[in-house]
Amino acid sequence: MKDMEKAVDILEKKISQKAKVRIIGDYDIDGVTSTYILMKGLARIGADVDTYIPDRVADGYGIHAHLIERAETDRIDTIVTCDNGIAAAAEIQMAKDKGMTVIITDHHEVPYREEKGERQMVLPPADAILNPKQYDCPYPNKNLCGAVVAFKYIAALYERFGVPAEELEDYYELAAIATVGDVMDLQGENRILVKEGLCRLKNTKNQGLQELIRANSLEDAKITAYHIGFVLGPCINASGRLDTAARSLALLNAKTKEEAARLAGDLTALNQSRKALTEKGKEEAIRIIETTELKNDRVLVVYLPDCHESLAGIIAGRIREKYHRPAFVLTGGETSAKGSGRSIESYSMYEELVKCAAVSYTHLTLPTT
């Protein structure tokens, strides 16, 4: 993967210098598992590492200026992003101006500009960027989730530091959960990772996952991709939607059975609340479409001012499924509308929104599928 050796060299040096490293993740299932993989992996090789997962409402997606300022206050030397960062050029430049080292691990689409009929990547000024979607990255699988990119990074670091390769096996189940939960194509390498992860998930050593399986009455079930996508995964996602993703990270990092059981119960209850709110929002969106001129639009844009912003993407997905048209759901923000979109195979939301970037949004993040 492009920049892998450079990224390994950087952290090898930083660890030898006992520099403070901060992982900045994301609040969804891919971001939480990515953060956990990097946190555990870097701690294993002796890094002085901590983590920060942005709050969906208070912070928004990705790395923002106030997170750079906080890192400066905390005397952080090196920032490692996961499942975000590729579109944060201004924020990365801010970190660089403050003397920090920045390593991006991400899997989202690379921003670009059109020049003479060709797309030119617009990359942030990070010290190393691990993202297989970079045009000049030779890594063959362009459809990795963020957790697998993080896993690849830890694998390379383990090799450099002489950590036994068998220790990587503990991350397979996390890679599988993120791959299914972030809706990656289950082909080739992804399929192999998911198969291996599912085999290990039933007998996982992770106390948090053990208790989450128990809280959802799956102790005796043959756990499949369905259970990740529709039972366990939504519980991990629920905290980032309705509470704080730190709760899901705490579940994965739980040290006792009692702590794990409590957190698993909390997440399962949150997911039940999420289901009820999603159904209510979906019904309202359908009512609006069916009773207005929206039903004639090729791209459906529905405004639900009272909908929790974290549910916009799920509801947009349900609308897309019902009408087989690209769908956006916008919710009320303090100074602007916030929302999420889900598309169909023949329509690239990313490309269409890039065309009207100057007027349509302040930050763009879309699913990679």
Give the label of every model feature segment:
Residues I86-A87:
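Phosphate/diphosphate-binding loops
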Residues I79-C82, C137-N141, V183:
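Flexible, glycine/proline-enriched loop segments at strand-loop-helix junctions
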Residues I103-T105, E109-P164, Y172:
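Conserved phosphate-handling catalytic cores of large alpha/beta enzymes
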Residues Y52, C82, T105-H107, L130-P132, ...:
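Generic beta-sheet signal
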Residues I92-P111, V183:
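Catalytic PLP-binding core of fold-type I/II PLP enzymes
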Residues A150, T365-T368:
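Intrinsically disordered, low-complexity repeat segments enriched in small/polar residues
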